[in-house]
Amino acid sequence: MSSIESLSIQGIRSFGTYADDLQSIKFSSPVTLILGENGCGKTTVVECLKYALTGECPPGSDRGKSFVHDPKIFGLNEVLAQIKMQVRDRRGAQVSICRTMKVSKKRNKMSFETMDSTINFLTGAGQSKREKQDSLSGRSVDIDVAISDFMGVSKAIINNVLFCHQEDSSWPLDESKKLKEKFDAIFGITEYNKALDKIIKLRKEAMEELKIKEANIKHVAYLKQEMEVKTLNLQKAQRKCDAIKAQCSECEEEMKPIEARLVEIRNVEFEIGKYQAQKVEMDTKHKNCKDQISTLTLKIKKPFRGTLDELDQEISNFDQRMLEMRQKRTEVEGDLSQIKRSSVAEQEKLGTQDRKHCLAKQRHQSELACRAQLLKRVKEFCRELHIPIDCDLVEQPEKMGEVLRDIEAMIITKHCEITEIVEQNEKADRSRQVKIDELRIELTKSEQSVTAQEKQRESSKRESETLGVEIKKIETSMQDLKKLEKEINEVNELYESATKNIDQQAIKDAIARKKASIAENQIQFKKLDEQLTFLGSMAKLVAECSLKQKELDKKNQEVHRVRSRHSDHFGKLFKEPITCNYRRSMQVVYEKLRREIQELNEKANTQKLKEQSYEIKRKNLISDISRMEKELKDSEELIYQKCRSTPYDDLLERSKTTISKLQFDHGALKSSEALYKKYIQKMDEEPSCPLCHHNMTSDEACDLTSELTDEIQKLPDNITRAEKALKAEQIKYENLLQLKPTILKVKELKDSLPQKKEELKKVEELLGDSVSEYETLIALIGEPTHNMELANSMMGDMSLLDEALKDSARLTKDLDLQKGQLPASYDSSVSMDDLQAEKSKVSKELETERKELESAQNAVQQQMDALNRLREKKNSLKDRQIHLREGLQSLPQLKERLEKLNSFLTTVASEISELKAKIQPLKLNLRAAIEEKERLKKSESEKLAQLNSKYNSYKSTDHDIQRLNKEAEDYAKLDLRNEIKKLDEIIMASKDKLRKLEAEISLKTDELETIKTECSNQQTVERDLKDNRELKQLEDKEAKLRESCQVLDKQLGNLDFHSVSKEKVNLTKQRDKATVRKGELLGQLGEIHSQVNKLQREIDEPRFKESLKNFRKANYEIEVTRLCIEDLGQYRLALEWALIQFHSEKMEMINRLIREYWRKIYRGNDIDYIQVKTDEVSSDASADRRKTYNYRVVQSKNYSEIEMRGRCSAGQRVLASLIIRLALAETFSSNCGVLALDEPTTNLDRANINSLCEALNCIVEERQSQSNFMLIIITHDENFVSSLGKITSYHRVFRNEECKSVIRRVEAGPSKKALIDQ
């Protein structure tokens, strides 16, 4: 059973929004009492419980805007609110529910927004976390549905029964429509009604669907028969197709060796072309190699006469010499960089020493200033403290320590004086506080005595009022007693007259007559049943005749249907009308059409073979043209890539000219270095121009020399660029030479392509004529083919028609035989249906008489019940008479108790007056003592503050002096004068070392320049050696190329190109013959394929392909639909019966509880009982209607039930609503034992309040054994609280000084109340 454990509220209505405003309440079993004044926030607790469980805002809150704390109160733009609730679900596991809301103020408009709703699963009661989940969020699931599931009750019960809002608490006496909605929601009738409507709708749809399926199955059966015929024809065509395919495979096998040999011949042709291309390439390379050899021979100044190995050795020796010179250059550069690094390091060292020297001088100045400031501060502080100084501290600095110790001793003395004053002040203050505490204790005792006396007076006063009311009631009951005796006499007279008016003998005679009439009808019913049994014995033979007749009518209809369907086709296929042997006549027509089509097909196939031969020739020509055009396009693209738009011969000549020019430029650059050096040498000897011999000034000569030197330095790069350009141009020239065969091939293709295209044009003309003639033949085949297909499609119906005619004749004969077997005594005018109708009529009369008998018996029973009720009323009146007499007997004791209470109240009033007179002087004395204590304490504090201020200034000055003394001692330890002298010596040594290093750098630089000049002079020799090596390599390459050309000539001679070409022509003729034969077979195969495809397409149509499956499926669906209709009818009846039974049982239980609670609680005598009346709405009693109910609350007055709405007082309305809610909670909330009552005493008088308390106490005692039972009562009536029995604690709701709602738990005891924070 689920229950509530705790609730936390923040930012709801008058509850504050800040963290310290959070209010919590822990609910206890069996009763949780919440007490508070009007408007302090009691009802807000119920609203929060309801909102946490259902997510619905309370009524009148403007969709939640006034439910959250108003932001206008504290001048905020938005307010966040949160409700946290911890519960135990119906399985006992702990669940935490948290709902967060926000109200924002934008442009003076308020908007409410739900921020988040979360369920957290806690562990508890032996339950693990639910399905390994920690929490559920409102973004992923419906939180309200989940909470209803956890609590074990529906949302309607939570809203309307368990946590009903005070404004909606009187809903049981609301208007009829709203009351019906509430009860339907509580019973869950709405969902069940939806299920019933769904079942009714499904049953109707199934019945309509059954009619449609029964009509459609005839068409499905016809398609199944058509499918079987077409499948047989398809299998014959496929067997013929397989035979032709085998012949085609034989042709392909004959062509395979021919094709293989043709592939080999093409490979030989490819090899010949490849060797020819290689030969052209080798010739080109050989010629280029010779040209390069001649060019290099001209460039070399000094040819090398040895071998290539000797030349490599010479180059290696030269490289060794150059390597030694480079190594020496690297060593000199390394030494120079090492010396430079040493110089830089020495300069950095000198800079570091300079910085240290400056820092030492600054510290020395700071030391002198610190010592001067220390002496000044010490002298001033000693004068302030009156400490004498006997020596000069400048000349004797060692005396400084003694002076500082004297200062420290004087400061400690001042601190001791302040401590003594503080102790004296505290002692005086404690004595004054003792006096104040004594006065306060005396005052508290007096006030507590007054409070206790007032409480005792109040309780006595309440008891006195209660006794007065009881005495008045007993005095007035004397008159009631007389009325009661009169009423008892009246009831006795009514009972006696009712007994006389009932004639039991007459009633028994009427019942006997009814029973005799029922017996006569039963005899007639039995006679009719025997007649039906006789007809039933003949029913089989009659039924067979009827079935035969129906079958005969069906066959005649089928014959008429088939004849009507094909009446137009009969006129088209037959010249004369036919009446029998339809299938045989149709087969004759079919064979005639087949022979005609076969003749036309043979002519068409002959023409098709011609067409295919032309088509093959055309495809071969197109293939050759495409291949030649592709080769032409590729060759032209290759030529374009190499030559662009320039003619090939012009480009070849231009490339050759460019190579010659580049070779000349390369040679000129190689020789220009020696020429420039010669010019420079001459200008050094005589400053004049080497060309015009013009005398130049020294500056002009120097500029020209520099310019020529720069040109010499650029020569290696210029030579490298010239060599790259020359090699690139040579490669281009070689590529152009390789392009020569492609040029020749393009010319050949351009000559042969027009011839091929002309041949293709002639073949296409012949192909067009052949296609036209073939199409004409195919068109002629169309009409007989259509007629043959029509005859073929009608063949099945003709078989059915012949079969139907035979069946019709057979059924006519069988029907005549069966009619002759019927007996002569059989009366055909008397049908079984008439007897069955008469039997039903007698059965209804029997049922009517039985109902009349039952109503008569019920009337007798009602009369007896009326007598019993009168007897019960008489007994209850006598019980009440006895109770009133007992009250009259206790009247003297009550009056005596009232007099004692009045005298006690007088005594207590005088004692309270005396105690209040003593309290005022005690308050004045206490206030005077407190003021005197505060005045003296303030004066002492001011004096002490002055002393402390002076002491703190002494302490600060002493701290500064100690700091200066510490700094002076630290400076003395550094010995700064000697440090400055050492740094001066180090700086002078570093400067001397730097001068030596600069001299070494100058020497090494000159040596490096000499080595660089020697290296540049060796480059000319290196170039000559490399040219000799390149010449040797080219000579070897030329010899190899010459050998390769000879080998290619020999290979081309070995390939017999003429015999290969002749063999290719013969094989091509053989292949063409086989292709023609294969074409003929393919033509036949195509025709058969068209038939197969046509049949396959027809079979693959959904109506034929799925015909068998659809036929079976249709039968299954019809049977299943019938069963579904029967099952849905049974399900609907079962569900409605269960609903009616559930509703009646629950309403009976609810009304029983309502009567029981009303008699316990209500103390009036005008209403005997109340109950919820259920009225069934009248509707047509069809299978597709469901029952609905209306609800109303009625009251019984003088044994007459009248509607309570509009006929009861405000108190009766409240009490009736409360009792109905109690009964509903007892009935429907078996899984949740929580019930909240908000202000249950509203509009109730004291008697009904007391009886309500007694009833609630009884409910609590009965349910106390259930640990999860919880009754939450919210009230402002403290007398109601005191009447609820043993309440050990309750929760008080009040407003604090900020007008925010606060919840405190109050322990209720006999003499004290303590507030305990939650």
UniProtKB/Swiss-Prot annotation:
- Which cofactors are required for activity? Zn(2+)
Q: Where found, per UniProt?
A: Nucleus; Chromosome; Chromosome, Telomere
What the record notes about the co-factor is: Binds 1 zinc ion per homodimer.
Q: Which UniProt keywords apply?
A: ATP-binding, Cell cycle, Chromosome, Coiled coil, DNA damage, DNA repair, Hydrolase, Magnesium, Meiosis, Metal-binding, Nucleotide-binding, Nucleus, Telomere, Zinc
Query: Which reaction does this enzyme catalyse, per its entry?
Result: ATP + H2O = ADP + phosphate + H(+)
Tell me what happens on changing T657A. Answer: In strain: MW6, NC357, NC358, NC361, NC362, NC375 and NC397
Biased composition, class Basic and acidic residues, residue ranges: 454-466
Q: What is its main location?
A: nucleus
- GO CC terms: chromosome, telomeric region; condensed chromosome; condensed nuclear chromosome; Mre11 complex; nucleus
Gene Ontology molecular functions: ATP binding; ATP hydrolysis activity; double-stranded DNA binding; double-stranded telomeric DNA binding; G-quadruplex DNA binding; metal ion binding; single-stranded telomeric DNA binding
How the protein is affected by changing D480N? Answer: In strain: MW6
Q: What class of enzyme is it?
A: hydrolase
Q: Which pairs of positions does the record mark as disulfide bonds?
A: none
Which positions in this protein are listed as binding ATP?
R13, N38, G39, G41, K42, T43, T44, V68, D70, Q166
Q: Which residues form the signal peptide?
A: none
SUPFAM superfamilies, per this entry?
P-loop containing nucleoside triphosphate hydrolases, Rad50 coiled-coil Zn hook
Q: What happens when the gene is disrupted?
A: Death during pupal stage, possibly due to the accumulation of DNA DSBs and the induction of apoptosis in third instar larvae.
Q: What is the effect of changing H219V?
A: In strain: NC335, NC362 and NC390
UniProt-reported outcome of changing C580S: In strain: MW25
- Can you state the subunit structure given in the record? Component of the MRN complex composed of two heterodimers RAD50 and MRE11 associated with a single NBS1.
Show the domain comment. The zinc-hook, which separates the large intramolecular coiled coil regions, contains 2 Cys residues that coordinate one molecule of zinc with the help of the 2 Cys residues of the zinc-hook of another RAD50 molecule, thereby forming a V-shaped homodimer. The two heads of the homodimer, which constitute the ATP-binding domain, interact with the MRE11 homodimer.
Family per UniProt? Belongs to the SMC family. RAD50 subfamily.
Q: What does this protein do?
A: Component of the MRN complex, which plays a central role in double-strand break (DSB) repair, DNA recombination, maintenance of telomere integrity and meiosis. The MRN complex is involved in the repair of DNA double-strand breaks (DSBs) via homologous recombination (HR), an error-free mechanism which primarily occurs during S and G2 phases. The complex (1) mediates the end resection of damaged DNA, which generates proper single-stranded DNA, a key initial steps in HR, and is (2) required for the recruitment of other repair factors and efficient activation of ATM and ATR upon DNA damage.
Record's protein name = DNA repair protein RAD50
